[in-house]
Amino acid sequence: MAEVLSSLDALSVANEAPVHVQKLDKFGRAYATGKRKDAVARVWVRPGTGKIIVNDRPVEVYFARPVLRLIINQPFAAAAREGAYDVVCTVSGGGLSGQAGALRHGISRALTFYEPELRGPLKKGGFLTRDSRVVERKKYGRAKARRSFQFSKR
């Protein structure tokens, strides 16, 4: 009887939700990667004053359009942590919009590694989900992915 109860206890432990703990490097930073379209962002987050450095340049210089900076700051707004963390990241591939989306994804993941209790609000906002939409490939016999060549009946 005792071994049956112990096996049931083992099953109930296996079915519990995973416990998320801090994942920090030796410098006290949380590291994560974010992806969007063809862009990949490597992100390091640590407590600070809210500075964001992208490819060794301030975010205001790298992302000149305000809407892109708004996209990058969305995870901090959703978690109510504006100005609480410094971000250092390298971004490569894709265009500016894809890079901003990759940075948003990476910042969100790094925040959950630093503060696991933020996982709920960030997941509810959709920041932890990898946006899988990519450009549709061009097909032969067509002008673009879906557009056909001009057709003349006569």
From Swiss-Prot:
Pfam families: Ribosomal_S9 (PF00380). Keywords: Ribonucleoprotein, Ribosomal protein. PROSITE patterns: RIBOSOMAL_S9 (PS00360). GO terms for biological process: translation. The keyword Ribosomal protein applies. InterPro entries: Ribosomal_Su5_D2-typ_SF, Ribosomal_uS9, Ribosomal_uS9_bac/plastid, Ribosomal_uS9_CS, Ribsml_uS5_D2-typ_fold_subgr. SUPFAM superfamilies: Ribosomal protein S5 domain 2-like. Signal peptide: none annotated. GO terms for cellular component: cytosolic small ribosomal subunit. The keyword Transmembrane does not apply. It comes from the Bacteria. GO terms for molecular function: RNA binding; structural constituent of ribosome. Belongs to the universal ribosomal protein uS9 family. This is Small ribosomal subunit protein uS9. The gene is rpsI.
